[in-house]
């Protein structure tokens, strides 16, 4: 049976961030995820989780200067020291909050960049991150992201993500499979899930093409949830979408899966 985590960076924007935990729990969610925890004390976030009976599925390591347009550091030559600092901080937060998944963003690469050098940097940084996280029982995730939403992002395809994980060779390095990004970049989502399930550490969903609720758009999510069940996926499914109107009003798709 699929288990869903509300993405508090995109959902429940009707509420102040710290109030989104209670709102998600009231709608039946038992887990949450979000992009970055670092504007709040880890202990405060843990208190919100505990007060509402929620599990933290994952969050991201800091991506560099998000406001300046940075979208990760892992594949950026010359930023290795900055990257390592983000891993240490993310693991400190995870140690308090209790999540066992951290997403590490690759970064934006100029069109004329030396991609081989960027890839070598990426592999080295991911090996460092996985080694540091292993001591804490944490899995590091990398996510192929579509270039329509994020032009220049280094990692775009599922097969490339899987190949990178295999090349690094760390048991706690896996792919964060976002059905939305996969559909936009390459399609054939069900077959990609079947092919790659052993290397998938987290799944996310959203309607395609506008990233609204999963019951809107071209993907048949009830079928994909059946595929995930058949494959034995028992992790959280992150709801990383932008509600068309009120978050709670758009949760009709979720109701059949609550209490099953």
Curated annotation (Swiss-Prot):
One Gene Ontology term of the molecular function aspect: metal ion binding
Q: Which organism is it from?
A: Cupriavidus necator (strain ATCC 17699 / DSM 428 / KCTC 22496 / NCIMB 10442 / H16 / Stanier 337) (Ralstonia eutropha)
Which residues are noted in the entry as Mg(2+)-binding? 143, 178, 204, 240
Give the matching Gene3D superfamilies: Divalent-metal-dependent TIM barrel enzymes
**What is the protein's given name?**
2-oxo-tetronate isomerase
Active site at 143, 240
Cross-referenced PANTHER family, in alphabetical order? HYDROXYPYRUVATE ISOMERASE, ISOMERASE
Reaction catalysis annotation: 2-dehydro-L-erythronate = 3-dehydro-L-erythronate; 2-dehydro-D-erythronate = 3-dehydro-D-erythronate
Query: Which phenotype arises from disrupting this gene?
Result: Deletion decreases growth with L-threonate or D-erythronate as carbon source. Deletion of both otnI and hyi abolishes growth with L-threonate or D-erythronate.
Q: Does the keyword Magnesium apply?
A: yes
């Amino acid at each position: 049976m699929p288990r869903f985590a509300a993405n508090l960076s995109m959902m429940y924007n009707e509420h102040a961030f710290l109030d989104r935990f209670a709102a998600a729990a009231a709608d039946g969610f038992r887990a949450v995820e979000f992009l970055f925890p670092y504007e709040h004390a880890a202990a405060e976030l843990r208190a919100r989780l505990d007060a509402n009976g929620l599990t933290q599925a994952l969050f991201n390591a800091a991506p560099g200067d998000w406001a300046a347009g940075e979208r990760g550091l892992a594949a950026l030559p010359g930023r290795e020291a900055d990257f390592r600092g983000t891993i240490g901080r993310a693991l400190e937060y995870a140690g308090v909050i209790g999540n066992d998944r951290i997403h590490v963003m690759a970064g934006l690469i100029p069109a004329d960049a030396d991609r081989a050098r960027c890839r070598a940097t990426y592999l080295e940084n991911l090996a460092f991150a996985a080694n540091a996280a292993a001591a804490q029982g944490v899995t590091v995730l990398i996510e192929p992201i579509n270039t329509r939403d994020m032009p220049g992002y280094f990692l775009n395809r599922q097969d490339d993500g899987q190949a990178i994980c295999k090349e690094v060779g760390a048991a706690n390095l896996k792919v964060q499979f976002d059905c939305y990004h996969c559909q936009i970049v390459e399609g054939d989502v069900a077959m990609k899930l079947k092919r790659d399930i052993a290397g998938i550490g987290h799944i996310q969903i959203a309607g395609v093409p506008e990233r609204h609720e999963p019951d809107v758009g071209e993907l048949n999510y009830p079928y994909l949830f059946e595929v995930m069940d058949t494959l034995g996926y028992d992790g959280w499914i992150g709801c990383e979408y932008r509600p068309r109107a009120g978050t709670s009003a758009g949760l009709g798709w979720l109701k059949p899966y609550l209490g099953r």
